Amino acid sequence: MTDLTLKALAAERQVSVDRLVQQFADAGIRKSADDSVSAQEKQTLLAHLNREAVSGPDKLTLQRKTRSTLNIPGTGGKSKSVQIEVRKKRTFVKRDPQEAERLAAEEQAQREAEEQARREAEEQAKREAQQKAEREAAEQAKREAAEKAKREAAEKDKVSNQQTDDMTKTAQAEKARRENEAAELKRKAEEEARRKLEEEARRVAEEARRMAEENKWTATPEPVEDTSDYHVTTSQHARQAEDENDREVEGGRGRGRNAKAARPAKKGKHAESKADREEARAAVRGGKGGKRKGSSLQQGFQKPAQAVNRDVVIGETITVGELANKMAVKGSQVIKAMMKLGAMATINQVIDQETAQLVAEEMGHKVILRRENELEEAVMSDRDTGAAAEPRAPVVTIMGHVDHGKTSLLDYIRSTKVASGEAGGITQHIGAYHVETDNGMITFLDTPGHAAFTSMRARGAQATDIVVLVVAADDGVMPQTIEAIQHAKAAGVPVVVAVNKIDKPEADPDRVKNELSQYGILPEEWGGESQFVHVSAKAGTGIDELLDAILLQAEVLELKAVRKGMASGAVIESFLDKGRGPVATVLVREGTLHKGDIVLCGFEYGRVRAMRNELGQEVLEAGPSIPVEILGLSGVPAAGDEVTVVRDEKKAREVALYRQGKFREVKLARQQKSKLENMFVNMTEGEVHEVNIVLKADVQGSVEAISDSLLKLSTDEVKVKIIGSGVGGITETDATLAAASNAILVGFNVRADASARKVIESESLDLRYYSVIYNLIDEVKAAMSGMLSPELKQQIIGLAEVRDVFKSPKFGAIAGCMVTEGTIKRHNPIRVLRDNVVIYEGELESLRRFKDDVNEVRNGMECGIGVKNYNDVRVGDMIEVFEIIEIQRTIA
């Protein structure tokens, strides 16, 4: 047989060459990959490998199977049996003796190190306690020495002042006694310090011993375990199903339930829990055997011995049920507490923060008020706004009747001042534009009707500075002209009158002045405050004078705005464009709006992706009083929404989502406003209240008669204010005006049209129809009477004469009285009269008759009266009992 090379032998044995070289080296034979291997060397290697296999670590593998049957109820009342087999496998490895010795040596070294550390910790604790005791003893000695020196100085002064030897002896005795006391105190302090030292050392030793025990148990070696579960254990639902099946089976057994032999207990944790459940069911059935051991499944809840005071977090609005859940009480208890406070509510009713705070504090809980708009306030406050205010251009809204040349006037101003020199005029009209004049810039709002004007004012945003009222010189004042006057007056905005069509032959400017003077618009030449400018939109006459009049009025108003910093403004109009998405026309009021800014606009937010001016040109920024069209919002905002530039887009999104969620609550809350029955709820002390009314009637005579009658109802406390009035049906403009002014809509022999009803329903306005003028006057008078503060009156209900005075340890002086008039009632306010002069006013605390507490004593009976916090009651005094009643005032 020829010798093989080592490489060929490795290929034959299917091992690597390096591995085979290492095995030869372990057997004591040095070989390389190209060396030949003889038969003798093969035998030597085989013997070496066999010895290694025999001397290897021993392994022991244990396998265990557990079989059980699970009954699962099926459809139709039948149960199905499922066989469950749980397999477990464990492998134990015998350690090498040398490895065991090494581990034992390491454990011994670790225990010695822990013991050394424990001894060092004990010694360190003893040293620290000793030093602490010495410091305390030294400080105590210093304090006692100082006290002793102070006492000696005091004693010395006292001895120097004393002249007799007897007093000197007394002082010396006192001094000796105090020294003894000081010594006793010092001894007690040393004992206390020694006791603390011993306790500290004992505690440290116990802690070190406990740590050593824990380390000992942690360091204990455990056999190497390889556990494999081949099946998932029974789930909780399966155990519940098994319990339900057992109950059904046991319920069907009428006899022999107790006589049945117990099944052998299963082993394992699942069997143990099943046994516990069986025991619990047996205890419930109340079988024989007397007192049973409590099952682990029985709940151990104990009712609290006293009320638990909680920290209740209350938002701006909360329902009664939510408040009860936060306080962990039943809703009926909260309703009872509210009834005690004088408020009726159902469990689903929304209450405000103040009411919820009163109820929670009344029930003994601590209230934490949380403002839900904290994030919104934080976002709004974290804005970089400039400090220096500069003059800004006025914002002008042009109003007037539809046929009076308002559109022509706007077109002429745009064609001459905005797009001069540009072929084709304006490329795009966005509802607002600004013009440059020699004296300054003016911004015009071109809004259809008065929608944006009133919606902004309803939201508290004063976007318009001046109103230009366009009146045709040949037509005079028309219904929409009157509506525009009412809107301007309600907003408190100055009016500049443009008398249009002055070039017509039938033009009569004086007639326009006379008609407008009836509505409070007086020209300056008549002593009024309104400027009248004669213009012609067709011929172009008077346009420059109109612009100068607007700038003059703006100069009087002294309009200023901050130009630098983050911008804020209002939405003039908005729409959804098919190619560009949500588009909003924004009028900047303060700061500068840049392209790329993050804006928060009502319920919407976004980054300004593009800005265009009224000419359709791309712009990068816009200052105060400049209208621009912005793209990039998440949705279409509403006209009149506030536009604010913020820093963080994520926070802007959170605020927008919060506003969307809050909108429903605000809408529900708005349903309670401007109701005649709830007018008195809005009453505030010290203010003159107003009942705002928008009146529409069938004829002008009815309007004047009703207006005069309502205005005559005004008093010093409640005023009737006619916000708007007119002839004809109730229109959408009337409803919008009522919503912006928080007014009541009154229709006399007229009705509201479809668009007005839609606004009335969405804004939850109070609309009332009348056909008899007396009913209208009476209901408004009742509403005004409800706004009057009630009158308080004191009514005497009883009088008692003091016949004798007794002393009571609980109430002090008790007056024995005879009731001479009326009835004496307990806990009522009283007055004590002596010689018909009031000497005390307080409250009746105790009322008894024949040692029994009573609530009232009638005329001709004797009783004992205890006056709260008053004991100077004398025989012959008169006790007067009265009650305070509220008299509701009415308007005559």
Curated annotation (Swiss-Prot):
Keywords: Cytoplasm, GTP-binding, Initiation factor, Nucleotide-binding, Protein biosynthesis. Residues 68-82 have a biased composition (Polar residues). GO terms for molecular function: GTP binding; GTPase activity; guanosine tetraphosphate binding; translation initiation factor activity. Residues 66-305 are annotated as: Disordered. Residues 93-159, 166-216, 270-282 have a biased composition (Basic and acidic residues). GO terms for cellular component: cytosol. InterPro entries: DNA-bd_dom_put_sf, EF-G-like_DII, EFTu-like_2, IF2_assoc_dom_bac, IF2_II, IF2_N, P-loop_NTPase, Small_GTP-bd. Residues 391-560 form the tr-type G domain. Residues 254-269 have a biased composition (Basic residues). Its main location: cytoplasm. Residues 500-503 are annotated as: G4. This is Translation initiation factor IF-2. It comes from Salmonella typhi.
